[in-house]
Amino acid sequence: MYSRSGIKSYRVSFDFYVSPAIKFLLIANFAVFIFEALLYRFSGPPAYGELLQWFGLVPARVILYLWQPFTYLFLHDLGSIWHILMNMFTLWMFGRELELVWGRNRFLRYYFMTGVGAGLVNVIVKMAPALFGQGIPRTAYIPTIGASGAIFGILVACAILFPGRRVYVFPLPVPLSMRTVVILMTVVTFLGTFGLGADNISHLCHLGGMLVGFVYLRRGSFLYSLRNSVSDWQYHRNQRRFKIYLGKHRKDPPSRPDNWVN
């Protein structure tokens, strides 16, 4: 990380420093991944499928398995090692700086809030047809796994806290601001959410994590603006009432007080 002409740039630091919360999450995720691999190897695909149905996020069953919006964050796809590697690398690269700014407890609260929130957004959207009497869609029985919802929430936090930070994005030869990177990712995720990306990636969870993180971090500004709007409305309302009162009593002679009250 360095400063040049007043612009902060961000380069991957290979000091391999791992903050406490990041260390906990890395160990937990890799431990669960190893357990998944061993279960698949020694018990076969049916047992692994049961694991995903129980602890992955299955929208049609989450009402009975209330732990799923939490546990799905620790499961990753065995079909590609890059799923967990990219998630954990991004967590380490960006999450440790957030933890240094926020502290361990606040960082963990934010991580799980965005991860669980992303899962709930996924559940609500996929179960929406059932609420309108159209039945439960087939996609509501497919388990969603991975920490990507929380990871995207972390990226949003970095874009809000460090908007001008310069990051290199492969394969682009020039660095982009953190805000620009997240905006581009939001556009891609939005298009993928509405079926414009033919893959098995849960773009909906990614978008949900970004949305929850943005709303949470911007809630102070929103509440401040809302409070000011209410105060302005009350002020103008009282001003109108005062003008009406003056209009009614303008011709009344002033009364002499018999005594003063302090």
Task: Please provide the spans of the model-predicted regions.
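C-terminal transmembrane module of polytopic alpha-helical membrane proteins
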Residues: 1-21, 28-30, 189-262
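N-terminal TM1-TM2 helical hairpin plus the immediately adjacent luminal interfacial "cap"
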Residues: 17-145, 191-218
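Short, motif-level signal for alpha-helix interfacial/capping segments enriched in acidic residues
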Residues: 57-63, 154-155, 183-187
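Alpha-helical transmembrane bundle and helix-membrane interface signal
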Residues: 100-101, 161-173, 221-227
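Cytoplasmic-side transmembrane-helix entry/capping segments in multi-pass membrane proteins
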Residues: 106-113, 148, 172-180
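Small-residue faces within membrane-embedded alpha-helices
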Residues: 115-119, 153, 157, 183
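Membrane-interface micro-motifs in multi-pass membrane enzymes
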Residues: 140-163, 205
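Membrane-embedded catalytic cores of phosphoryl/pyrophosphoryl-handling enzymes
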Residues: 169, 175-186, 195
